[in-house]
Amino acid sequence: MALLPDKEKLLRNFLRCANWEEKYLYIIELGQRLTELRDEDRSPQNSIQGCQSQVWIVMRQNAHGIIELQGDSDAAIVKGLIAVVFILYDQMTPQDIVSFDVRPWFEKMALTQHLTPSRSQGLEAMIRAIRAKAAALS
């Protein structure tokens, strides 16, 4: 995730955007920075149900117990939202992910009130899936 900013820089960059068009473009740019997902990882077990777009999220635990996330979507804005979620969960253990509430970060960014209801539901589905996978590993 070296190409993605940390949580604090994400928030600073997001708040520097002059309007929501710039914020959407920034989210899309973050999605473009994600590591390419391998074709074999675009499988049903990595598919996230509850998203209008196709979304795949792969979770692996490294030798130090830290979760590594990879993901992709067929929609640019959704891929950017995946990147935002990954930034928030960066360098966490499964236990950290289960106990960490991303919603205050979304509130600071005023993110959810500017998403369509289906995108908000998809974002919630991604978070639920990541937390469930983390709970299974903890």
Swiss-Prot record:
Task: Give an example GO cellular component term for this record.
Answer: cytoplasm
Q: Which UniProt keywords apply?
A: Cytoplasm
**Subcellular location, record wording:** Cytoplasm
Q: Which residues form the active site?
A: C51
A Pfam family per the record: SufE
Pathway membership, UniProt: Cofactor biosynthesis; iron-sulfur cluster biosynthesis
Q: Which GO terms describe its biological process?
A: iron-sulfur cluster assembly; sulfur compound metabolic process
Please indicate which superkingdom the organism of origin belongs to: Bacteria
Q: What does this protein do?
A: Participates in cysteine desulfuration mediated by SufS. Cysteine desulfuration mobilizes sulfur from L-cysteine to yield L-alanine and constitutes an essential step in sulfur metabolism for biosynthesis of a variety of sulfur-containing biomolecules. Functions as a sulfur acceptor for SufS, by mediating the direct transfer of the sulfur atom from the S-sulfanylcysteine of SufS, an intermediate product of cysteine desulfuration process.
Instruction: Supply the PANTHER family for this chain.
Output: CYSTEINE DESULFURATION PROTEIN SUFE, SULFUR ACCEPTOR PROTEIN CSDE
What HAMAP family has UniProt attached to this entry?
SufE (MF_01832)
As for family, the record states:
Belongs to the SufE family.
Q: What is said about its interaction partners and assembly? A: Homodimer. Interacts with SufS.
Which protein are we looking at? Answer: Cysteine desulfuration protein SufE
Q: Lineage from the top down?
A: Bacteria, Pseudomonadati, Pseudomonadota, Gammaproteobacteria, Enterobacterales
